[in-house]
């Protein structure tokens, strides 16, 4: 796998293709970042972008993880003391999950977001941005019917973080797309380059296959989950014999979250996936690619129950180091 393939593997979108290709031609010394609100224990959404950071490190990038304590405060996630304590725990979990500690810089937002220059640049961006545009950028991230003034400033800070961190590539889930497009539009107004961005897919709710997996509603997987928790959640997961399920009766689109987690979490981290089965049911199945596993689920060779058993096992292997770190 060459640098371009590793950088773009499992990406839902890159902006722009030409900019990513140029980085792939000479990735050494390039820097990518993801920002995370330190608002809780790592869950499968954090792990999806962390997988991409691991890919980027293997491609030659240096990585910055922004533990966005000021953002979390503006988003009403607790006091600074509480948020910073959570940030320290999250840092340790990211390392336990597999980020290369020697090649990862962890930065608190408050290390630079309270400086005079940053504040003045932020005010300049406020002058360039309508409230409606800021609300649209924030709508995919926050919940609730109304946006507070602090939350409207939030996406402008995300845009400004990119040049202040000195990064070449902004990484986030598809819910960050509007923020990154806002950044491309407004940063040139303060003589900063429009950022290159890479967006990871959104995984559907584990129980229903609808919407997106969320730590605030529905069913998700986190580093607090025991092996038994993981097995229970995965066993109850929605898993039809196809990667492209029919929509619900009321027209909502659905995905197969079991296959999504195999594709975006398991296969990027394991060269081979073994599905254990008793000899009386044909013995073990072994896959060296996601496509092969998907094809055998659709053909009937792989039963959904056996796929779920394997998924729970590999998820537990990924999560166990972080779970052990949390227990210390």
Swiss-Prot record:
The keyword DNA damage does not apply. It catalyses: tRNA(Tyr) + L-tyrosine + ATP = L-tyrosyl-tRNA(Tyr) + AMP + diphosphate + H(+). Its EC number is 6.1.1.1. Transmembrane segments: none annotated. L-tyrosine binds at residues 33, 154, 158, 161, 176. One of its GO terms (biological process) is tyrosyl-tRNA aminoacylation. It comes from the Archaea. Residues 193-227 are annotated as: Disordered. A motif ('KMSKS' region) lies at residues 212-216. One of its GO terms (cellular component) is cytoplasm. Signal peptide: none annotated. Homodimer. Catalyzes the attachment of tyrosine to tRNA(Tyr) in a two-step reaction: tyrosine is first activated by ATP to form Tyr-AMP and then transferred to the acceptor end of tRNA(Tyr). Belongs to the class-I aminoacyl-tRNA synthetase family. TyrS type 3 subfamily. PANTHER family: TYROSINE--TRNA LIGASE, CYTOPLASMIC, TYROSINE-TRNA LIGASE. This is Tyrosine--tRNA ligase. It comes from Halorubrum lacusprofundi (strain ATCC 49239 / DSM 5036 / JCM 8891 / ACAM 34).
């Amino acid at each position: 796998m060459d640098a371009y393939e590793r950088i773009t593997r499992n990406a839902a979108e890159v902006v722009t293709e030409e900019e990513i290709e140029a980085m792939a031609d000479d990735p050494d010394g390039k820097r990518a970042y993801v920002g995370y609100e330190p608002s809780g224990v790592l869950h499968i959404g954090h792990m999806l972008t962390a997988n991409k950071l691991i890919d980027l490190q293997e491609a030659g990038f240096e990585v910055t993880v922004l533990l966005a304590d000021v953002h979390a405060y503006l988003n009403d996630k607790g006091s600074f003391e509480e948020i910073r304590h959570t940030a320290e725990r999250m840092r340790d979990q990211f390392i336990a999950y597999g980020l290369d500690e020697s090649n990862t810089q962890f930065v608190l937002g408050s290390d630079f977001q309270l400086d005079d220059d940053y504040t003045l640049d932020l005010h300049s961006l406020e002058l360039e941005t309508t409230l409606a545009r800021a609300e649209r950028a924030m709508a995919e991230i926050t919940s609730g019917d109304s946006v507070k003034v602090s939350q409207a400033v939030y996406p402008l800070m995300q845009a400004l973080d990119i040049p202040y961190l000195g990064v070449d590539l902004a990484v986030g889930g598809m819910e960050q797309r509007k923020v990154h497009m806002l950044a491309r539009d407004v940063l040139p107004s303060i003589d900063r380059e429009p950022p290159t961005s890479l967006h990871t897919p959104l995984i559907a709710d584990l129980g229903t296959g609808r919407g997106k997996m969320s730590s605030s509603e529905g069913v998700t997987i986190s580093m607090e989950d025991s092996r038994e928790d993981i097995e229970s959640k995965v066993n109850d997961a929605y898993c039809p014999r196809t990667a492209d399920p029919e929509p619900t009766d009321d027209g909502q689109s659905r995905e197969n979250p079991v296959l999504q987690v195999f594709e975006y979490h398991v296969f990027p981290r394991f060269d081979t996936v073994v599905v254990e089965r008793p000899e009386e049911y044909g013995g073990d199945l072994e896959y060296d690619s996601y496509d092969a596993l998907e094809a055998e689920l659709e053909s009937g060779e792989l039963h959904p129950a056996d796929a779920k058993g394997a998924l729970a096992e590999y998820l537990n292997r990924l999560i166990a180091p972080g779970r052990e770190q949390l227990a210390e």
